[in-house]
From Swiss-Prot:
Name by which UniProt lists this protein: Porphobilinogen deaminase
NCBIfam families, per database record: hemC
Enzyme class: transferase
Biological process, per Gene Ontology: protoporphyrinogen IX biosynthetic process
Cofactors named for this entry: dipyrromethane
Other remarks in the entry: The porphobilinogen subunits are added to the dipyrromethane group.
Keywords in alphabetical order: Porphyrin biosynthesis, Transferase
Subunit note: Monomer.
Lineage: Bacteria, Pseudomonadati, Pseudomonadota, Alphaproteobacteria, Rhodobacterales
Catalytic activity: 4 porphobilinogen + H2O = hydroxymethylbilane + 4 NH4(+)
Organism (species): Paracoccus denitrificans (strain Pd 1222)
Pathway field: Porphyrin-containing compound metabolism; protoporphyrin-IX biosynthesis; coproporphyrinogen-III from 5-aminolevulinate: step 2/4
UniProt remark on cofactor binding: Binds 1 dipyrromethane group covalently.
Pfam families from the UniProt entry: Porphobil_deam (PF01379), Porphobil_deamC (PF03900)
Amino acid sequence: MTQMPDPQNPIRIGTRGSALALAQAHETRDRLMAAHGLAADAFRIVVIKTTGDRVLDRPLKEIGGKGLFTREIEDALLAHEIDIAVHSMKDMPTIQPEGLVIDCYLPREDVRDAFVSAQFAAISELPQGAVVGSSSLRRRAQLAARRPDLKLVEFRGNVQTRLKKLEDGVAVATFLAMAGLTRLGMLHVARGAVEPDEMLPAVAQGCIGVERRADDARTASLLAAISDRDSALRVTAERAFLARLDGSCQTPIAGLAELQGDRLRLRGEILRPDGSEVIAAERVGPAADGAAMGTDLAEELRGRAPADFFDWS
């Protein structure tokens, strides 16, 4: 029988300190409380500052990519300073440190990007040469492919920071994740959602993953009760696609898996950072074969890409 956490021996939940990260940590805690009949004092939220949180004046590609938002948290997990780590799966490297595993995924939120602007209701309404802020290479490349006339500027920081930059006139529009706005109770900020056919989202966008030590059987048992099968199937396919492409924050890659009964539709695309070339394809097959489909889709895109396509610096 699994030993339940209590106030003297709580489950320590590691998280970044932004409002969104804390909302995700609290959602994880609340789901565990409901699944196991536990009180809030059987858990402790542990805030850990990552390199990505500290260095805000340089683009992500200059300071190391996805691991910037996870490394310190994973170090704390390996050092037994926390018991689980709550992550936005779109920020996670495809290779995890030895001794750690993610096999718990919460029900996935809205995967779409949100268009945010005080002046305009949609991308199509942006005037020629309008300034748009984004730190996402994927969004910048997709926007450049569709609207090469727009001026794109770097927009680092959390949701509140980016909204303040918009208010200050640094740009007339930006993009955020619908999932993040939903979790923050800020859906009113979005002028509208951008459909995947128009802007394919980041791999694993909208999905929370919970990381644990591979040898921690008690925690594995607790987390199994809150893991969502559909989210796991979709994210597994998307991350297999990303892994074969060696995807990081330095790589404009988009991917989305959608379940249709026991079938999975997986779409993927790769882009040059300036939007001058987009290569896209999709696969449909048994949901259980998602990882193989992801790898196969990535192989097709790599095969269709010119030799210099991945030489991005």
